[in-house]
Structure formats: C-alpha cells, structure tokens
Regions:
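Charge-enriched, short contiguous segments at helix-coil
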Residues: 1-25
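Short N-terminal micro-motifs specific to bacterial/archaeal maturation
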Residues: 4, 38-41, 70, 112-115, ...
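Short, well-ordered alpha-helical segments
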Residues: 11-15, 48, 147
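Tandem CBS (Bateman) regulatory domains
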Residues: 20-37, 75-134, 152-165
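A structural micro-motif recognizing beta-strand termini
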Residues: 42-46, 58, 116-120, 130, ...
C-alpha cells in the first residue's frame, strides 16, 4: 500500500531532529555555556590557608600558579591522595606546608587539559571519553595554559546536560 505510514511525526521527534540538525550545522562552542569565574591560588600560599578557603567556599577543583604561570590543577582527589601519603609518615603537620606540596611529579597522568574559547563542546565530550583520568578542562582565549582563565568544564557539567536531553 502506497499510503502505509511507518511513523507519525510528533512534536518531540520533530524538535529533536531540528536540534540535531542545528548541532551539526552550527556546533556549540564551550563559551558562553561554560564561562565562569575560576579562582586560582599561588603555589607559595600556606596549605592551612588554602584548606580553610576550600572548606569555606566549597571548592573542589582549582588551578595552582607559580607567579601567574599555570602549574597544576588541584582537586579534592589530589588532596585526599596527598593526605593519605603524608599520613604514612605519622602525624600530619601543616605548619610549614605550602600549596605547592600538593603537586605530584610522578608523571603518571595529567588530570586536566586546556582548550581555546572556540573549541566545540562535542570535542570536549570526546576528550572526557578518551581520557578517563581527566578531571577538568580549563578554557582560555587561545588554549594557552598561562592565559586568563575564562571557564572550567568538569565531566558532570557535560553529562548532566546529556541527561537533561
């Protein structure tokens, strides 16, 4: 039968097809969606002061700088690992510890990447899929680690959006 219909278009399906078409023709870039103020700290900041700020402001990830030059991304996981290592030496004394003490140079992996403001969101999704240890993607104008931070993307920022769709 020529008039046999295999599917009836409905508003949801039509809207979804139009959304997909829009994403293919004009992929969304990381900015403005992931634009946000990112607080960073200098490596010589006393660790007790840094931990106090984390507790007060509930930061979970933040960049560490050496005189304005990016050095590392510190996360709660990194702090937990550092505390576990330090506890093996006995009582943990924070009096002379600096933020820089949290930086591990074991060369195992990098938990961050930098991207430019013009990076497509689908590229960021791919980065998170391909690098399971990635905890954050930091956004600068041109992807330069020492550039002004314009935003940060965590895996949950991407995947919460996917769940909403």
């Amino acid at each position: 039968a020529v008039d046999f219909v295999i599917a009836e278009p409905n508003d949801w399906a039509v809207n979804k097809i139009q959304q997909i078409e829009g994403e293919l023709l004009q992929p969304e870039t990381v900015l403005p969606r992931f634009s946000k103020h990112v607080t960073g700290f200098e490596r010589d900041l006393p660790l007790s002061e840094l931990l106090g700020t984390i507790a007060r402001k509930r930061y979970s990830q933040f960049p560490l700088y050496n005189k304005g030059k990016f050095e590392a991304l510190i996360t709660l996981r990194v702090i937990g690992f550092w505390l576990a290592k330090e506890s093996q030496k006995g009582t943990i004394d924070l009096t002379r510890k600096k933020a820089a003490d949290l930086i591990f140079k074991d060369g195992k992996y990098t938990n961050y990447r930098f991207v430019s403001a013009s990076t497509y969101i689908f590229e960021v999704e791919e980065m998170f899929r391909e690098q399971g240890t990635l905890e954050a993607i930091l956004i600068t104008k041109d992807g330069n680690p020492n550039g002004n931070l314009l935003g940060i993307i965590r895996p949950r920022d991407i995947y919460h959006q996917v769940e909403k769709d």
